């Protein structure tokens, strides 16, 4: 499921984001990209779509993944390397980016596992 989240950056199949995240008041996300506030489901989906649509030639690597299961709750932590071309469609320009970061995803299991919270942040070079 975590790979599905980041594969959207390659496939641009944004409906997959709705399939793997729970649409409820309990959903939340945080990141080091503005806005810095705690985001709800609809805000997170909109920002994820904007981010992934703005990066062409997207690729990622998940390293040092640790998964812990506590009944119907799962916690996944890992280091994340992302790269691609950040595209400005209005100015017809692009900039190569490489982001080294870390991530925590909290999952809950109802009928199937879904993301209920995630936190992404960059590691300073």
Each PLM stretch: what is its role?
Residues 1-13:
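Short, aromatic-enriched amphipathic alpha-helices that serve as compact interaction elements
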């Amino acid at each position: 499921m975590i790979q599905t989240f980041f594969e959207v950056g390659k496939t641009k199949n944004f409906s997959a984001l709705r399939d793997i995240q729970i649409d409820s008041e309990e959903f939340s996300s945080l990141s080091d990209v503005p806005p810095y506030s705690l985001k709800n489901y609809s805000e997170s989906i909109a920002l994820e779509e904007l981010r992934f649509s703005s990066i062409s030639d997207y690729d990622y690597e998940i390293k040092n993944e640790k998964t812990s299961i506590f009944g119907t709750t799962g916690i996944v932590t890992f280091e994340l390397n992302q790269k691609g071309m950040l595209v400005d469609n209005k100015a017809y320009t692009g900039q190569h980016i490489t982001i080294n970061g870390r991530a925590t995803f909290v999952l809950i299991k109802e009928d199937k596992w879904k993301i209920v919270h995630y936190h992404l942040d960059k590691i300073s070079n």
